[in-house]
Amino acid sequence: SLSSAASDVYKRQVLKNENLIPISKESKSIVVAGRGADNLGMQCGGWTINWQGGQGDITIGTTILDGIKESVSTETKVIHSKDGTDLGNVSGDLAIVVIGEDPYTEFFGDKDNLDLLEEDIQTINNLKDKGYKVLVLLISGRPMNIADHLDNWDGFAAIWLPGTEGNGVSDILFGDFQSTGKLSYPWPLNAEDGANAPENGLLYNIGFGL
């Protein structure tokens, strides 16, 4: 059911929160940016409609952007900017940036490294350069290399593949439901090390989640 799909999203992990979550529903304005903000296909990942999944409106559902719009006051202006540049003359202090992996299945997901895309990093930097506090939501099927970037982020949540119910994500962001998620495995400093090189250190240990 839709309710059970949304409730599953509440198990995602908030891993860094510098007084951003819960976000006020009465905020004057909120910027929502990133490739994944308005992308159902990216939310769902592989094995969705097609073998490799797809981008955009490949099925019926609620994007994270739409979930945010439904959560806030009618007086709150939600500005959608894919790369964090075209904001017009709107002033504000909070940007929610949805980044992560494109859909994949099986060996198509094999990669030499698990670094963030330069496009995603640039979007975040565009907003930080404008003075915004940035809350990063990472869509992925595995831990990625974020250690070098985390200090630049004011908040971070691993939302994995939330599926069609983007409103489940916004419920957590705006305090309608408390995130109950705890990591079921460690998040390494370098994702390529995984569990095979614990001596290289961990970013987050098993069971972590705010």
What would you call each of these model-derived segments?
Residues 1-6, 10:
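Single conserved hydrophobic/aromatic residue that forms the stacking wall/gate
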Residues 15-33, 72, 87-93, 128-129:
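Glycine-rich phosphate/diphosphate-binding loops that line cofactor/substrate pockets in enzymes
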Residues 21-23, 74-82, 135-138, 178-189, ...:
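Acidic/polar loop patches that form or flank catalytic/metal-binding clefts of enzymes
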Residues 24-26, 33-36, 40-42, 81-83, ...:
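Generic beta-strand/beta-sheet core signal
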Residues 38-66, 70-71, 107-118:
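Glycine- and acidic-residue-enriched helix-capping/strand-helix junction motifs
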Residues 79-131, 137-151:
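Hydrophobic helix-and-loop "lid/oligomerization" segment in the mid-to-C-terminal part
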Residues 157-192:
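Active-site-proximal C-terminal subdomain of hydrolase catalytic domains
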Residues 196-210:
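A structural supersecondary motif
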